[in-house]
Regions:
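Conserved segment of the helicase C-terminal RecA-like domain
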Residues: 344-347, 351-354, 359-404
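Helicase-associated low-complexity/disordered flanking segments
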Residues: 1-62, 267-298
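Conserved P-loop/Walker A NTP-binding site and adjacent catalytic elements of P-loop NTPases
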Residues: 35-222, 226, 244-270, 304
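Conserved two-lobed SF2 helicase motor
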Residues: 128-144, 299-313, 319-339
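Conserved interdomain hinge at the start of the Helicase C-terminal
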Residues: 224-250, 257-260, 314-323
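Conserved C-terminal RecA-like helicase domain
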Residues: 91-93, 101, 108-117, 252-327, ...
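A short beta-strand element within the Helicase C-terminal
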Residues: 152-155, 327-352, 381-387
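Non-catalytic terminal extensions of ATP-dependent helicases
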Residues: 302, 321-322, 405-814
Length: 853
């Protein structure tokens, strides 16, 4: 058996992965695993858990259709342990990266760092480990590329109800159809009737499928429909001891609005607030939203949604797991397996916007959310509350005010639902409670990428694609359509000479690629090959070369929708002001306004190039370009992360911006060939790395620190603070660019004569609005204007003194201002606090001045 330091308390009970003998018998595996469960975890397993693990040890597939909180994770642990003991590589798949990441760290804790890896398309950690956590698409693409040769011994598919998702369901169905020698554990609390799934899996693998769907809910639920305002509902729950409460919203803005409202109503006790303050003592809330979150947390109110920085989201989860937060306001991401233990779920609505229209919640969606109520081991029951629509709450308030006075009751004017409003009532709630999750309707699609993955496997790819369609759980009409789509794709690939065939001796055909394909082309940035081709259109001698390369990279990235909406809103506001000044009539202003959108650099060039590329490279038809300017905008305006958030008023979406910058960094660093990089591009790549790491390094840091701390408050602090630096300056080039950008941004603001903005930036180091007003008055007495062109931004006008880097952890900097007369007698000077700057991602000064030499 292996040592616990490297392999965790459970991993140490299995043979090391590199040992020759890894074939422990099933009885011994059972004894070791359940001995660990009782002795180390201190848990008494339920009968359905023992049954499921015995079925897995017998070699059967298991469909675990049991309620939330019924211990599905323990069964998955048993499967991973059995795989380790028998020399098989096991996989855990989930629909979202956050859940994959959470499970990765959970498994590292019990199996050890050496035994667990993670692959999410943009993150690869220990990818050769015997236990792999990944998104469903990662496994599906591997199954298509490798088929039954894939080194996939067994798979735990979490949230298997996603197989019914119209866009992504194919990724849950494909492995079941293409990995006949793999053992599957399919898990969800809301699968509904699974007979068809079990029959299909048994038919495809010739292996028994055991369905476990009779496990009792460990914590029963009670339900309430209320006409009370939300604040009163939360207050009553707090008084009755029905905390912690998760208030479910269907938009991020609504979640924050409620959190800020509840923070002023006293939802926590003095003792709770003191405990929270102690737990977050070491946490650095460096961003605009971070400061909002800090205020909320100190009142006992948490917030949780996908627009937050990952480190803040995981901090809230950790505080909730410690039982420190009485109330969390969040979105319905709660229903996707995120580990936030709660007693009560309060739904602010029974409708949601699904991307096209408002509609009522489906039974599966409702049970996914409601099922999170009730903490096993703490609660005897969980509470699910649904709020009535706001107009009904107002009506109830008016009726209550009238009391039992018939005359007053007669005068009450009842409000009606707003026009077009999708409403709900007590009956809606009752039906959702009683309704079983809808029977899953599996989805399948055929794309160029899927076909090319099959061709990569070798052999008769066409036959395998036809079999994939025929074996799928689709209707005959759907299968016919899929076959037609496959015909189109294969014909296009033949016409463009991307694939060829070779006849075998037995008369069959082998398919092979006739072009070089990038590794993992369908997993990471699928348009990387287009980017490489498009770069040839640019002139490296052009002054705009670096910015245009950035624009080409950005066009291949997923849109950060909240950021682009903010850009569009600002552009339209500015255009409206100009049109009013020009005297345009209202109707004409409205017509022109519809044509204004966010910046799309190189749009015409890129569209023409991509049209040609799709003709030459057919698999590109699965994707599309989306020109935009976020990184370019930040570079051109010398913006840092905080300044950009402030400029577009997108503090609520800073997590979205960070993810986008992280994607841009990876694409620039991985995809653009070295011979296409100039010094400015290398500067931008280094700068992006510093920004991304300093704003949120939680994933890398938690991996590096996994298992290193048992102290809860220390662990919480580590999630919200940058990682320890091996040297005073970790990335010299990136940090230099960050500082130069910050100083030149001030030069740009001097050109615009913005003392208020400059004062807000520099008041902390003694240069507030009044100081800047005096400096600007003196400057413009001597010079007519400030230059902000490329020459003004050049390295010749920036001075850096590093002599106190090691002893004082500081740099002295000087940005010379390129004035209208070319005197260069004015400058911004300062001493940089290197530690604070690197930890916050924005420049922090020890001292600062605007000087006239």
């Amino acid at each position: 058996m292996a040592d616990t330091e490297h392999y965790g308390s459970l991993g140490a009970l299995a043979p090391a992965w590199d040992e020759g003998e890894r074939n422990i018998d099933t009885d011994e595996i059972y004894e070791r695993f359940f001995g660990w469960v009782t002795d180390v975890k201190g848990v008494e397993p339920w009968p359905h858990q023992e049954e499921a693990i015995m079925d897995l040890l017998a070699g059967d597939h298991v469909i675990l259709n049991t309620p939330t909180g019924s211990g599905k994770s323990l069964v998955a642990l048993g499967m991973h342990f059995a795989a380790l003991c028998t020399g098989r590589r096991s996989y855990y798949t989930a629909p979202i990266k956050a859940l994959v990441s959470e499970k990765f760290f959970d498994l590292v804790e019990v199996f050890g760092r050496d035994n667990v890896g993670m692959i999410t398309g943009d993150t690869h950690i220990n990818a050769d480990a015997p236990i792999i956590c990944c998104t469903a698409e990662i496994l599906a693409n591997q199954a298509l590329r490798e088929g039954r040769r894939a080194d996939v011994g067994c798979v735990a598919m979490d949230e298997f109800h996603y197989s019914g998702d119209s866009e992504r369901g194919w990724a849950w169905q494909v492995p079941l159809l293409t990995l006949p020698d793999t053992q599957f554990l399919l898990m969800s609390a809301t699968l509904g009737n699974v007979d068809a799934i079990a029959d299909k899996l048994e038919d495809m693998t010739d292996t028994d499928v055991d369905v476990i769907a009779d496990a009792p809910r460990p914590v029963p639920l009670t339900y309430e429909y209320t006409l009370d305002p939300l604040e009163k509902t939360v207050e009553l729950a707090f008084r009755k001891g029905e905390t912690p409460i998760y208030v479910v919203h269907f938009s991020q803005d609504a979640a924050l609005d409620t959190a800020q409202s509840l923070a002023s109503t006293g939802v926590s006790s003095k003792e709770q607030r003191q405990a929270i303050a102690e737990a977050i003592k070491g946490v650095k809330f460096t961003t605009a939203f971070g400061k909002i979150l800090q205020r909320l947390l100190r009142t006992g109110v948490g917030i949780h949604h996908a627009g937050m920085l990952p480190r803040y989201r995981r901090l809230v989860e950790q505080l909730a797991q410690q039982g420190l937060l009485p109330v969390i306001c969040g979105t319905d991401t709660l229903g996707v397996g995120i580990n936030v233990p709660i007693h009560s779920v309060v739904l602010t609505a029974l409708t949601k916007f699904d991307g096209t229209k408002m509609r009522r919640l489906r039974a599966r969606e409702f049970h996914q959310i409601a099922g999170r109520a009730g903490r096993m081991g703490f609660d005897t029951e969980g509470l699910v509350v649904a709020e009535a629509p706001e107009y009904e709450i107002e009506n109830a308030k008016a009726v209550a005010k009238a009391g039992n006075d018939p005359k007053k009751l007669k005068k009450v004017k009842r409000k009606k639902a707003p026009e077009g409003f999708v409403t709900w009532n007590q009956s809606t709630f009752d039906k959702l409670i009683d309704a079983a999750p809808e029977t899953l309707v599996p989805h399948m699609k055929i794309t160029h990428s899927m076909v090319l993955n099959e061709v990569t496997q070798g052999g008769d790819a066409r036959r395998r694609v036809d079999e994939l369609i025929d074996d799928s759980a689709q209707t005959p009409d759907q299968k016919e359509h899929l076959h037609e789509r496959a015909d189109e794709i294969f014909q296009t690939l033949f016409d463009t000479k991307v694939i060829e065939t070779e006849e075998r001796d037995d008369g069959g055909l082998d398919y092979f690629l006739d072009v070089d394909m990038p590794d993992d082309f369908a997993l990471d940035q699928p348009l990387s090959p287009f980017l490489l081709a498009a770069l040839e259109l640019l002139d490296p001698e052009s002054d705009m070369y670096a910015l245009d390369v950035i624009s080409m990279v950005e066009a291949t990235l997923e849109d950060p929708k909240q950021v682009l909406r903010a850009q569009e809103r600002q552009a339209r506001d500015a255009a409206m002001i100009r049109m009013k000044e020009d005297g345009l009539e209202y109707d004409e202003r409205m017509d022109r306004l519809q044509e204004i959108t966010y910046p799309k650099p190189l749009e015409d060039m890129l569209d023409a190039a991509f049209d040609q590329y799709r003709h030459d490279v057919p698999w590109a038809n699965d994707y599309w370009l989306s020109p935009k300017s976020v990184v370019r905008d930040m570079v051109e305006t010398a913006s840092d992360f905080t300044g950009y958030i402030s400029r577009y008023n997108i503090a609520r979406s800073e997590g979205t911006l960070l993810r986008y910058l992280s994607d841009a960094y990876r694409a620039l660093a991985r995809t653009v060939p070295d011979d296409k990089l100039d010094d400015q591009l290398r500067d931008v790549i280094s700068w992006l790395r510093v920004v991304v790491r300093s704003i949120d390094s939680s994933l890398v840091d938690e991996w590096e620190n996994a298992g290193a701390s048992d102290d809860a408050s220390q662990a919480a602090a580590s999630l919200a603070a940058p990682g320890a630096k091996a040297a005073v300056v970790e990335d010299r080039r990136g940090l230099t660019v960050l500082i130069r950008n910050a100083l030149f941004h001030r030069v740009q603001l001097m050109d615009l004569d913005k003392p208020e903005t400059l004062g807000a930036l520099d008041k902390e180091w003694g240069y507030g609005v009044h100081e800047w007003e005096d400096a600007l008055d003196d400057f413009y007495d001597e010079h007519e204007y400030v230059n902000t062109d490329a020459k003004a931004r050049s390295a010749e006008l920036f001075m850096l003194d590093e002599k106190h880097e090691n002893d004082e952890h500081s740099w002295h900097v000087r940005q010379i201002i390129d004035d209208s007369d070319g005197d260069h007698d004015w400058a911004i000077t300062g001493t940089i606090d290197l530690d604070a700057t690197q930890s916050s991602g924005e420049v922090v000064f020890f001292d600062y001045a605007v000087t006239n030499d």
